[in-house]
């Protein structure tokens, strides 16, 4: 006989259809819309069973939170006697979220979630237990900060300090690799392992870049262009310096009185004779200190010195000793005035190149 009233009977654990076993395992309780129960003719037995079922439900409520009943989800009206089941305070809002509260029997999905959470907490605790790594990162960051626009260790650190810091960075990288292997063995999922590995690799790259920048600031290198230009400039100044050195040797070999007396006539000749002006302009002006002057002269350099001597030498009469009243300077100027027409009358032989044009032959065709 099927009941017309919307009432269902709750049976004991281990009953015929095992409704309470499903309830203990966290399944949705079948409501009135799912099944109809056969109600026995003896109403007294039904009421006793119903009361015992209520007591068992209260015991289960204390152990773990229950899900919503199907009758509550559907919004159907319940019988007056079922109001205690409908107004349970321990019912959860989400029928798919089960939070185990110490029950010994759990489904495998919940066990996996619990294990994942425990392993993540262990990883976080391990990361907090390594403050030495963060303490070592502090001085590396402070080294790269400039003071008033100038790096702290620019030109002041020695190579030994740089080597020790490099060794410390390599040791730290080894420690990071060990941590990475330990974290990979502890993390539950492949995605979390990949993220942890990526973070460790990025941290290691940052440390290596900081060490590289630190070494660059400690050992400033010269410009390659300056290194190339320096020997070229020194080689270009060598011949002029040699000529200047030979001229100084010539002036030292002369008598001191003759050198003093010949200084004014040479100046006068340079001013009066225009042919000597280009030679004076072409004289070298680069002078090196005596420590840098070349000492070894080749045969070709000696020949050049002799040619320069012949070019610079000018015929002049022997000067008399200079009297103290300064009349010698007047005599030198007179000699210069007498000597100037002789210089103008001298003819220098300059070979000229004459290009002969070939005569065009008229050919009759």
Swiss-Prot record:
Pfam family name, one: DUF4657
Annotated InterPro entries: DUF4657
Comp. bias regions, Basic and acidic residues: 239-257, 331-341
Sequence segments annotated as region (Disordered): 218-262, 315-342
PANTHER family xref list: SIMILAR TO 9930012K11RIK PROTEIN (PTHR37336:SF1)
UniProt protein name: Uncharacterized protein C8orf58 homolog
């Amino acid at each position: 006989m099927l009941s017309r009233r919307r009432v269902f009977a709750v049976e004991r654990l281990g009953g015929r259809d095992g409704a309470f076993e499903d309830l203990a395992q966290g399944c949705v309780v079948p409501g009135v819309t799912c099944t109809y129960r056969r109600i026995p003719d003896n109403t007294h037995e039904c009421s006793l069973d119903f009361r015992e079922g209520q007591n068992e439900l209260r015991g289960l409520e204390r152990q773990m939170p229950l899900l919503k009943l199907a009758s509550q989800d559907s919004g159907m009206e319940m019988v007056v006697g079922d109001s205690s089941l409908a107004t349970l305070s321990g019912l959860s809002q989400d029928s798919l979220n089960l939070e185990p509260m110490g029950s010994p029997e759990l489904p495998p999905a919940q066990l996996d979630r619990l294990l994942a959470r425990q392993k993540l907490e262990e990883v976080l605790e391990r990361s907090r237990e390594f403050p030495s790594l963060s303490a070592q990162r502090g001085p590396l960051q402070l080294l790269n900060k400039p003071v008033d626009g100038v790096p702290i260790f620019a030109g002041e650190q020695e190579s030994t300090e740089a080597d020790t810091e490099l060794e410390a960075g390599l040791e730290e990288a080894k420690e990071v690799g060990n941590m990475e292997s330990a974290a990979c063995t502890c993390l539950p999922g492949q995605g979390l392992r990949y993220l942890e590995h990526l973070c460790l690799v990025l941290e290691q790259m940052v440390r290596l870049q900081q060490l590289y920048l630190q070494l660059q600031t400690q050992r400033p290198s010269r410009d390659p262009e300056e290194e190339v230009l320096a020997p070229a400039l020194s080689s270009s100044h060598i011949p002029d310096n040699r000529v200047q050195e030979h001229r100084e040797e010539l002036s030292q070999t002369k008598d001191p009185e003759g050198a003093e007396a010949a200084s004014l006539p040479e100046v006068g000749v340079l001013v009066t004779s225009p042919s000597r002006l280009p030679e004076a302009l072409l004289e070298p002006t680069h002078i090196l200190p005596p420590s840098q002057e070349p000492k070894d002269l080749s045969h070709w350099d000696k020949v050049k010195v002799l040619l320069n001597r012949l070019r610079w030498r000018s015929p002049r009469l022997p000067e008399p000793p200079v009297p103290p009243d300064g009349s010698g300077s007047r005599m030198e100027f007179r000699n210069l005035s007498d000597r100037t027409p002789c210089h103008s009358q001298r003819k220098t032989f300059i070979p000229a190149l004459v290009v002969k044009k070939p005569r065009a032959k008229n050919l009759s065709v």
